Regions:
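Tandem CBS (Cystathionine beta-synthase) repeat/Bateman regulatory domains
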Residues: 1-125
Length: 125
């Protein structure tokens, strides 16, 4: 059974970095980072602490469907919070079960309060 730590090492070998955003930044900025980095979600950090996750799904469901603008809306208004996190010692299978049971597609990995990485439901393999 592969651990989260092993998966994060593998992702690092393939230069898969974790990109983040702050809660006060505008949704448009988050969308630009996601598009530029070709990722579907960003952990939201405030003073180095994960306070949420913003995803393309959050954008579609909480902004577009309500006719709101990404220019004037802060990330904090649509991010998923409170956030469920896991640590690097957990198995990937356990984390996939957490995502499935919680209807999540992304799961931040936190160790001693520090963000180590972001798991995706696509990491299942």
């Amino acid at each position: 059974m592969k651990s989260v730590a092993e998966l994060l090492k593998l992702k690092a070998k393939h230069n898969q970095q974790v990109h983040t955003i702050a809660p006060h930044q505008m949704v448009l900025e988050a969308l630009m980072v996601m598009a530029e980095k070709n990722v579907g979600a960003l952990p939201v950090l405030e003073n180095g602490v994960v306070v949420g996750v913003i995803s393309e799904r959050d954008y579609a469901r909480k902004l577009v469907l309500h006719g709101r603008s990404s220019v004037g809306t802060p990330v904090s208004a649509i991010m998923s919070s409170p956030v469920i996190t896991v640590d690097s010692h957990q198995s990937v299978d356990t984390c996939m079960n957490i995502m499935t049971d919680s209807h999540l597609r992304h799961l931040p990995v936190v160790e001693n309060g520090q963000l180590l990485g972001l798991l995706s439901i696509g990491d299942r393999s």
